[in-house]
C-alpha cells in the first residue's frame, strides 16, 4: 500500500493533482480542503495517501492531515459510500464540521453536500456516531457550540425542548464551556426566543 507520497507538484486540476516522485508521475485525487492548501505547481508537496484497488483501476487519494485520511477511511466503511462520495463529503465540509454534525445529529448539514440525500445523511450519522473520536483532534475552528454539545443537547431534550430548539440554543454556547454552564447559557437563549 502507498501510505505517503512526497515529490514535486506538477499539475492541479480539481480534484486531481499530478505529483512527480523521482521521475514517476502519480495522479492523486484530493478533497477540496486539501486542494486549496496545496503549494504552487513546481513546489514540493507531501501527502498522506489511501490506495483504492478496483478491478479496473488503482486510485490514489491524498490528504494533508492524518485526521482527513482517517475520516476518509471511516467513511469508506459505511454501506453505500464509495471513495467518490467520501471525497465529496470531505470537500463539502471540514473534519471538524463533520464531527460536529455527527455529534449534534445534524442531517440537514450533511444534505448540503452535493450527492448526499436525506437517507444517506441519516445513514452517515448513524454509522459514524462514536467513531469520529480522539484521533480527529479537537473541534477548534468549527462553529462548534461547545466541547460538551451532546451532553447539553441531551439535557435540553430531557427538559422537554424540541431538538430544533435545543440545537438552535446550543449554537450560542462558546467552545470550551462546561456542561452546566452550557445548559445555563442555552436556557437563557431559549428564554429570549
Swiss-Prot record:
Annotated region described as Domain I, given as residue ranges: 1-64
Region (Domain III): 144-193
GO biological-process terms attached to the record: DNA recombination; DNA repair
MF GO annotations: ATP binding; four-way junction DNA binding; four-way junction helicase activity
InterPro entries: DNA_helicase_Holl-junc_RuvA_I, Hlx-hairpin-Hlx_DNA-bd_motif, NA-bd_OB-fold, RuvA, RuvA_2-like, RuvA_C, RuvA_C_sf
GO cellular component: cytoplasm; Holliday junction helicase complex; Holliday junction resolvase complex
Keyword DNA damage in annotation: yes
Compartment(s) where it occurs, according to its Swiss-Prot or TrEMBL record: Cytoplasm
Protein task: The RuvA-RuvB-RuvC complex processes Holliday junction (HJ) DNA during genetic recombination and DNA repair, while the RuvA-RuvB complex plays an important role in the rescue of blocked DNA replication forks via replication fork reversal (RFR). RuvA specifically binds to HJ cruciform DNA, conferring on it an open structure. The RuvB hexamer acts as an ATP-dependent pump, pulling dsDNA into and through the RuvAB complex. HJ branch migration allows RuvC to scan DNA until it finds its consensus sequence, where it cleaves and resolves the cruciform DNA.
Domain observations: Has three domains with a flexible linker between the domains II and III and assumes an 'L' shape. Domain III is highly mobile and contacts RuvB.
Family per record: Belongs to the RuvA family.
Protein name in the entry: Holliday junction branch migration complex subunit RuvA
Organism for this UniProt entry: Burkholderia thailandensis (strain ATCC 700388 / DSM 13276 / CCUG 48851 / CIP 106301 / E264)
Name of the coding gene: ruvA
Amino acid at each position: 500500500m502507498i501510505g505517503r507520497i512526497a515529490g514535486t507538484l506538477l499539475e492541479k486540476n480539481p480534484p486531481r493533482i499530478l505529483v512527480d516522485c523521482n521521475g514517476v508521475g502519480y495522479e492523486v485525487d484530493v478533497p477540496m480542503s486539501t486542494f486549496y492548501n496545496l503549494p504552487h505547481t513546481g513546489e514540493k508537496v507531501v501527502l498522506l495517501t489511501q490506495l483504492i484497488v478496483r478491478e479496473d483501476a488503482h486510485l490514489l487519494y491524498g490528504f494533508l492531515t492524518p485526521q482527513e485520511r482517517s475520516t476518509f477511511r471511516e467513511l469508506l466503511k459505511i454501506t453505500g459510500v464509495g471513495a467518490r462520495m467520501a471525497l465529496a463529503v470531505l470537500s463539502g465540509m471540514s473534519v471538524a464540521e463533520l464531527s460536529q454534525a455527527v455529534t449534534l445529529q445534524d442531517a440537514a448539514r450533511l444534505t448540503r453536500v452535493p450527492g448526499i440525500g436525506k437517507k444517506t445523511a441519516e445513514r452517515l450519522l448513524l454509522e459514524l456516531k462514536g467513531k469520529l473520536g480522539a484521533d480527529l483532534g479537537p473541534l477548534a475552528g468549527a462553529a462548534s457550540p461547545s466541547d460538551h454539545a451532546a451532553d447539553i443537547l441531551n439535557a435540553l431534550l430531557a427538559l422537554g425542548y424540541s431538538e430544533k430548539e435545543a440545537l438552535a440554543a446550543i449554537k450560542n454556547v462558546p467552545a470550551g464551556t462546561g456542561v452546566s454552564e452550557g445548559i445555563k447559557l442555552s436556557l437563557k437563549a431559549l428564554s429570549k426566543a
